[in-house]
Amino acid sequence: MAEMNPAQGRVVFEDVAIYFSQEEWGHLDEAQRLLYRDVMLENLALLSSLGCCHGAEDEEAPLEPGVSVGVSQVMAPKPCLSTQKTQPCETCSSLLKDILRLAEHDGTHPEQGLYTCPAHLHQHQKEQIREKLSRGDGGRPTYVKNHRVHMAGKTFLCSECGKVFSHKHKLADHQKIHTGERPYKCSKCGMLFMERSTLNRHQRTHTGERPYECNECGKAFLCKSHLVRHQTIHSGERPYECSECGKLFMWSSTLITHQRVHTGKRPYGCSECGKFFKCNSNLFRHYKIHTGKRSYGCSECGKFFTERSTLSRHQRVHTGERPYECNECGKSFSLKSVLIQHQRVHTGERPYECSECGKAFLTKSHLICHQTVHTAAKQCSECGKFFRYNSTLLRHQKVHTG
């Protein structure tokens, strides 16, 4: 076996830690402190189990034969380690350098002699550290930034963005984001995907397969994440609130999309025509206008549609289905959007207001029609007569054309 690299042969706790002052520790929030505690305890347990030391004072401790420890790169320079002893032992008043050595020292007192098994002692030491960290008296805390000690492990670094992966194939998948590579093609519509799993999910849109079924209502979905989102409908929980208008949402993604109504932000742009959209799904649907692909055909009349949902709505013309019922008057509608508009008759809500005169309307189309009152009148080129609406002008012109 090749001789172990001396740089890898000895691992001390400081090799995987970054030291901060007490003042710097005070700037960390609770989540960061909890992360520090959990990572440090995990590293402590692993180093202890391997017989590795925790600091420079244990320089001569032997490493267990046949075990190599790979250390993830620390992303900030490690400052010079202080030799000041700041941690008092509550039993004998001895001063120790840090809470790690204090935890080890605590195990030497007679009342703790019952920890004859190393595993039990290590567990006790971890509890000592956890207690001290919870009290906030950690002295000079060591904030470990998401880096772990891996036994005989490797990490794979993306040269483009610096992100680290535990497996080579995960790095390869990630790098397709930078290269733009999409090696998986749908045989039905020609769409390209970065990952085979994404292609498999997409192909269900063509086959109609929906393997994930809700046990409450029986509705089925293409992928598990869609089912999980749907199930919140049954619980009624809406934990995400808009700080602007107070509206509540079931999902954080819906809240983010909604907030663009207030900010006017439209981050998704079409590379073909330059039109921008509030959410990615709207851009995806819009792209089909440029490709001209209509994959979903009606079996009754042969008409084709770009979206399965549009086909489903269209088929209600043939079936006569009206699944959306008004709970005020019992009237039914084929589209949910039409039901929402109808319900404003009962509530009196008129959300579309004219910026010129303040008059409000039930629907946006009614507002647009009204706004022509404030714009220039339409004149007939034949007789010079004026009309308020373009549609009225077109009807009038038939008098001249016959």
UniProtKB/Swiss-Prot annotation:
GO terms for molecular function: DNA-binding transcription factor activity; RNA polymerase II cis-regulatory region sequence-specific DNA binding; zinc ion binding. It is found in: Nucleus. GO terms for cellular component: nucleus. Keywords: DNA-binding, Metal-binding, Nucleus, Repeat, Transcription, Transcription regulation, Zinc, Zinc-finger. Residues 11-82 form the KRAB domain. InterPro entries: Ikaros_C2H2-ZF, KRAB, KRAB_dom_sf, Znf_C2H2_sf, Znf_C2H2_type. PANTHER family: KLUMPFUSS, ISOFORM B-RELATED, ZINC FINGER PROTEIN. This is Zinc finger protein 547.
